């Protein structure tokens, strides 16, 4: 049973003025929002990753690697100075 789904063909959507009016606003807006999210540092706060200047402290200049999988929680606490 062949038939049509009743949807508009993709070529009609791409050539419509309405599509480009909507997307000429939304695509740059998403780009600007993403740029602001990263450049203001909010991405670091939301995802909990250290900022580039926080990877190495004055006390610890080596890479913070977890080496023992069974005592990883203790290593994380030690590396992040959580007591």
From Swiss-Prot:
The chain crosses the membrane at residues 21-35. GO terms for molecular function: electron transfer activity; heme binding; iron ion binding. It is a single-pass membrane protein. Gene3D superfamilies: Photosystem II cytochrome b559, alpha subunit (1.20.5.860). Its main location: plastid. It holds the Pfam family Cytochrom_B559. Keywords: Chloroplast, Electron transport, Heme, Iron, Membrane, Metal-binding, Photosynthesis, Photosystem II, Plastid, Thylakoid, Transmembrane, Transmembrane helix, Transport. Its cofactor is heme b. GO terms for cellular component: chloroplast thylakoid membrane; photosystem II reaction center. One of its GO terms (biological process) is photosynthetic electron transport chain. It is found in: Plastid, Chloroplast thylakoid membrane. Heme binds at residue 23. With its partner (PsbF) binds heme. PSII binds additional chlorophylls, carotenoids and specific lipids. This b-type cytochrome is tightly associated with the reaction center of photosystem II (PSII). PSII is a light-driven water:plastoquinone oxidoreductase that uses light energy to abstract electrons from H(2)O, generating O(2) and a proton gradient subsequently used for ATP formation. It consists of a core antenna complex that captures photons, and an electron transfer chain that converts photonic excitation into a charge separation. Belongs to the PsbE/PsbF family. Heterodimer of an alpha subunit and a beta subunit. PSII is composed of 1 copy each of membrane proteins PsbA, PsbB, PsbC, PsbD, PsbE, PsbF, PsbH, PsbI, PsbJ, PsbK, PsbL, PsbM, PsbT, PsbX, PsbY, PsbZ, Psb30/Ycf12, at least 3 peripheral proteins of the oxygen-evolving complex and a large number of cofactors. It forms dimeric complexes. NCBIfam families: cyt_b559_alpha. This is Cytochrome b559 subunit alpha. It comes from Tupiella akineta. The lineage of its organism: Eukaryota, Viridiplantae, Chlorophyta, Ulvophyceae, OUU clade.
